């Protein structure tokens, strides 16, 4: 189960699911790629068996991630099998020499994110507020439950405007997308927004905007583009 949806930024009810499964023999895996380092408190209080995380979402190095397995009792771990075979590194689950530099970078990024999470999220919230200020006057819908949304992502449908036209309008200054990076090469409608039951016109007009606490871009130019977009909304 996703911790945070990669297209809308909405957090999923992992604590409720974990509690519901705690008394069963079901193994619970959380893909925490989007939420780790941002919503660590919910991960600490959730009952899970497996947790997937990655470094580059924390500002750490690319090419390193981790699968955390929780023990049930002293010895019992969730039963997993390797996808690659060769050496017996990492208890035989993943062959190959451990990339020490990447591991160290991952560890430091995780430590800093945990320590500075509140500060980082406050900075991201300010960016989100600035973006929404620039979009005032436009006819749009924010997709996803904003009460449970990370302040690092906006999924917005502009009424009466195709997303491709918006991409072309802002491409020289801003990098918008119509989905998460893992689906950026797909021209099919967003399966996430489709599953949410959005009408076709909102799906076609949806753009995804994301940022981090490092984002220091000048958003004033966005107003110029939104003025031209408003002619079609």
Which residues does each predicted region cover?
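Active-site phosphate-binding strand-loop segment of PLP-dependent enzymes
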Residues: 1-37
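Conserved C-terminal alpha-helix-loop-beta "cap" of PLP-dependent enzymes
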Residues: 154-208
